[in-house]
Regions:
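Short alpha-helical segments that sit at the start of domains
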Residues: 1-27, 31
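Short acidic, hydrophobic short linear motifs in intrinsically disordered regions
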Residues: 30-42
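Alpha-helical hairpin
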Residues: 12-13, 49, 84
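Short, cationic-aromatic polyanion-contact patches
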Residues: 72-94
Length: 96
């Protein structure tokens, strides 16, 4: 290993995980609820997903520490609000 060079770790994601992460980052400034992604996104590919698929992939992204979640009130229900972590915000990982 060369001195002064930091190797950026790589994370392999599925197409749907990349899509959700991209929409969350670009359209929602890094934070949104699952139903909010479906309702307010302009991405046609994302709109083809079900809420169950979005939730499942968000949980996998959370397991990989790429998103975090916090319980908040959304339209009268308590749901997870998903936010990108600093790894994504500061591009500390390479997404494959």
């Amino acid at each position: 290993m060369k001195r002064g060079i930091i190797e950026i770790p790589e994370v392999k994601l599925s197409y749907k995980q990349k899509l959700i992460l991209e929409v969350l980052t670009d359209e929602f400034h890094g934070a949104a609820f699952g139903p909010e992604l479906l309702k307010e996104s302009d991405n046609d590919e994302l709109k083809k997903l079900t809420i169950n698929e979005i939730t499942w992939h968000m949980l996998r992204l959370r397991d990989a520490a790429l998103v975090s979640s916090e319980k908040k009130n959304y339209e009268g229900r308590v749901l997870n609000c998903y936010s990108i972590t600093d790894y994504i915000k500061y591009e500390a990982v390479k997404i494959k």
